[in-house]
A protein has these predicted regions:
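Basic amphipathic alpha-helical segments that dock to polyanions
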Residues: 48-55
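Short beta-strand "wing" residues that participate in macromolecule-binding interfaces
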Residues: 63
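N-terminal helix-turn-helix DNA-binding core of bacterial DNA-binding proteins
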Residues: 3-47
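Short secondary-structure boundary/capping segments
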Residues: 33, 53, 68-69
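Glycine-centered, phosphate/nucleic-acid-interacting loop/turn motifs that mediate DNA/RNA or nucleotide
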Residues: 59
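Amphipathic alpha-helical dimerization/coiled-coil segments
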Residues: 85-112
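Basic, amphipathic "hinge/linker" alpha-helix immediately C-terminal to the N-terminal HTH DNA-binding motif
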Residues: 69-91
Length: 112
């Protein structure tokens, strides 16, 4: 199980990374997260929508109401230029953390 702290820290870059390829609505984002994480990250509506609203208020996303292919009215989110810049910054930071941890964790020492 992944800690709530790590999930919270990774939410923004994950959402921005998903939306960089095009607009999506909340349920699609939740399903995409589940898919890319192999089911280890299971987001809920209650977790996602407040984050989307904060990101929109912060200028990282814009939204619009649109009828989906299924004929339902849904709120679609799209990344802004500011969101792209934020994603670039987040990506650099996470890559640095990943690089440092990779060096520390490979190979794992045996416990004797």
């Amino acid at each position: 199980m992944i800690s709530k702290t790590l999930i919270a820290a990774s939410t923004k870059p994950i959402i921005l990374s998903i939306l960089i390829s095009g607009e999506d609505y909340g349920y699609q984002i939740i399903q995409r997260v589940k898919e890319i994480s192999g089911g280890t990250l299971e987001w809920s509506d209650n977790m996602l929508y407040p984050v989307l609203r904060r990101m929109e208020k912060g200028g990282l996303l814009v939204s619009r109401w649109k009828i989906s292919r299924e004929g339902r009215l849904r709120r679609y989110y799209r990344i802004t230029e500011q969101g792209r810049e934020e994603l670039d910054s987040e990506r650099r930071q996470w890559m640095s953390v990943n690089q440092a941890l990779s060096k520390l964790w490979k190979p794992l020492p045996s416990l004797k």
